[in-house]
Design a protein with these regions (language model features):
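Structural preference for solvent-exposed beta-strand-turn elements
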Residues: 1-164
Length: 164
């Protein structure tokens, strides 16, 4: 596992919406291998607070308030599926707008320090990690992590077999 296609979908922040979203995939036998859901409003509130604390807020308060009001209605889903092409088709037909991005997927040892090792290798190579998400089970030897990085090609050269 190295280059993976990640799907990004803005999902309405409403009861039952995730069930509707996953039902469309289930009906067409598309399996979700990894997923991250981020509340858009919480992210923007945190950014607003940090910008205020550092004195680096670049827009007036009413600008942020307008964006916060709009973002309160959505969450962002990032996910990896077993068939990204089919998932895009299914979700598009269900009325969702889907963005596809290439990301790096690594199967890592599920032990303390491995994420530190990987992030250090990427940093030492001058590669920025925009975000990552992943998971492993305590009784499993492996964990799957997804990385969105500034230089995918260079990152893949560090981990050509998809393992650190």
């Amino acid at each position: 596992m190295s280059i993976r296609e990640q799907l990004e979908v803005m999902l309405a922040d409403a009861p039952g919406e995730l069930a509707r979203f996953t039902s469309a995939l289930k009906e067409e036998h598309v399996n979700i291998e990894a997923m991250s859901i981020q509340d858009a409003n919480e992210y923007l509130l945190a950014l607003y607070d940090v910008r205020g604390q550092t004195g680096r807020r670049v827009a007036p308060r009413d600008y942020y308030e307008a964006i916060l009001k709009e973002s309160a209605r959505y969450s962002m889903i990032r996910m990896i599926t077993d068939n990204s092409q089919k998932a895009v088709e299914v979700l598009t037909n269900a009325g969702y707008q889907v963005k596809v991005q290439e990301v790096m997927g690594l199967v890592m040892d599920n032990r303390p320090g491995i994420l530190n090792k990987v992030s250090k290798q990427l940093g030492d190579a001058g590669i920025n990690i925009h975000y990552t998400y992943g998971s492993g089970f305590s009784d499993s030897d492996n964990a799957l992590f997804i990385f969105r990085v500034s230089d995918l090609k260079k990152a893949l050269e560090l981990f050509p077999d998809g393992h650190p």
